[in-house]
Amino acid sequence: MTAFHLQSGRITSEFGAKPRDDELDLYGLTHPGKVRAENQDHFLLCTVHPQAVIHATSLPDPDELQARGQRLATVMLVADGVGGSAAGREASQLAAETIMRYVTSTLRSYPAMGSQHDEDFLTALRAAALEADATVRSAAAERAQATGRLSSKSMATTLTLALAVWPWLYVVHVGDSRCYFFWNGDLQQVTRDQTMAQDLVDKGALPADRAAQSPFSHVLASSIGGPETSPEVSRVDITKRGCVILMCTDGLTKHVPDAEIATHLGAMQSAEQVCHALLDLALERGGSDNITVLAARAPRKQ
């Protein structure tokens, strides 16, 4: 298991004010689970200054992304590789690194532009996801040419990026790695699962309460590097003090339903504690896939 932590400090901000860095409680971990031989998940927690100051990541060489300056945003990212062998892990790593380079360069100016430019910001996030897709496809083609063993469609990954630019959380995702928003006992799934099962639900061909049991529940309809890549973007108000952002790969949600996630978030003592509690539940129930969990909270005023 790989885990990283940035603990909150003294709490002094007023309700609804932008939290300081030392008020944020951030934690992320990843675990291979009990079945898979390799962990193909990657994650990242960082703050964007002019570039990125890495607080937590599973990426092997993040130093080139780092630089300091005034904080512009906070980033949470998860990527769940598919494709077998080392291809899935390479795909998730490439996607994560590519979108972060895009965020720390092309998107640097957006946080200062104001809410009137939200559509431009969301368009840029879509472009960042498509840039990651192009990078993974290029790597897959090079691998296929070099080895003759992999097709250009054999490397793929999910990708979910949440970028907190006060007072909004902007989310772009491809695949079924989820972003949740929790406040005052209410858990909302921000992202839409891009799976064949969810497509059937949307078309009215499958009841929503049967989607999790469907054989198509984890068959991706959209992925980075896959046959179809359709980034979706959304925006969430994060001014409520005590709200929690949770992100995870499907290694968690295969074993832990939303109701239990909400219960644990409602009783959470810290981001570290809740991530470990959810991981332990998934492992106790089989740990059939790689498991990655990230949590972020701006604590309530005391």
Name each model feature, range by range:
Residues 1-302:
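PP2C/PPM-type serine/threonine phosphatase catalytic domain
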